[in-house]
């Protein structure tokens, strides 16, 4: 519902033309996503790696932005990818704003409050795009914990006001989404996934242990296909011996193939001492891996 409210309805109201092609807002969302990646990496470096050079920042941000599968979403600009990209963009903007809030001095209350509220608004809007991505809201804990829990700022009057600014956007968006869900699907907690007009019955997909291992290997270690014409890489299909129906899509490689920066996870044991002195960073890494 959020992409419709942000793009489809305003476009129809201004032009009188229905059915805005998803490709147009997806291009804008892709640029906003890339901007958020650069902003997030900058704030993360400012907090945890203040001695990092500009070259290291640019290389990391460019690698993170280009390593995500935005290109795949733009390659298939349908309603399905539209919602995914919108949700991912809001997730990155939320994390960026929360890091900005954590890095903002407490004497700059207006800027601090704005970053907290805007970040929460973005994360709340994720539920109206791709509800599963709301799991990334857990990253607010290690980001904001040192200031508001460790330093006990939450127990002060100003801290309580900042907490209200953090919570209020979530409550307002949640009320709106729950009202919409109840009006359209009969329950405030039903986001309509079971009503998708798709190739399979969403209400009977079930959970099968036999599908876990092939899916994990495919989406982590899968590699793209190769062809003799530009761009030389092609999509491949998931191969499985599961004795049953497995709904799959074309993919261009798993996480480790599309995002080589993840190879750096192999060096985490070497950074144990540094991570030991940065508990919040260690928690962020663990939560990202879990999500």
Question: What role is predicted for each listed range?
Answer:
Residues 1-291:
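Membrane-proximal envelope and lipid/glycan-remodeling enzymes
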């Amino acid at each position: 519902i959020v992409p419709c409210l942000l793009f489809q309805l305003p476009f129809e109201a201004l032009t009188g033309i229905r059915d805005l092609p998803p490709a147009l807002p997806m291009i804008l969302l892709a640029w906003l996503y890339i901007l958020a990646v650069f902003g997030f990496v900058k704030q993360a470096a400012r907090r945890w790696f203040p001695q990092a050079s500009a070259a290291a920042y640019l290389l990391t941000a460019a690698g993170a932005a280009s390593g995500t599968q935005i290109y795949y979403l733009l390659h298939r600009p349908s309603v399905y990818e539209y919602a995914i990209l919108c949700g991912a963009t809001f997730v990155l903007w939320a994390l960026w704003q929360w890091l900005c809030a954590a890095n903002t001095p407490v004497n700059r209350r207006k800027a601090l409050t704005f970053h907290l509220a805007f970040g929460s608004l973005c994360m709340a809007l994720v539920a109206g795009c791709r509800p599963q991505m709301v799991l990334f809201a857990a990253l607010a804990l290690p980001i904001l914990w040192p200031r508001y829990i460790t330093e006990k700022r939450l127990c002060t009057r100003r801290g309580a006001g900042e907490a209200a600014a953090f919570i209020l956007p979530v409550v307002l968006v949640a009320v709106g989404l729950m009202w919409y869900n109840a009006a359209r699907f009969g329950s405030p907690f039903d986001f309509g996934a079971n009503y998708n007009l798709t190739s399979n019955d969403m209400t009977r997909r079930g959970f099968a242990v036999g599908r876990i291992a092939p899916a994990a290997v495919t989406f982590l270690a899968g590699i793209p296909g190769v062809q003799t014409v530009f761009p030389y890489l092609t999509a491949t299909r998931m191969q499985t011996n599961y004795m049953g129906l497995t709904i799959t899509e074309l993919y261009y490689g798993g996480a480790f193939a599309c995002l080589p920066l993840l190879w750096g996870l192999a060096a985490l044991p070497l950074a144990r001492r540094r991570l030991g002195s940065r508990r919040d960073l260690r928690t962020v890494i663990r939560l990202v891996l879990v999500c």
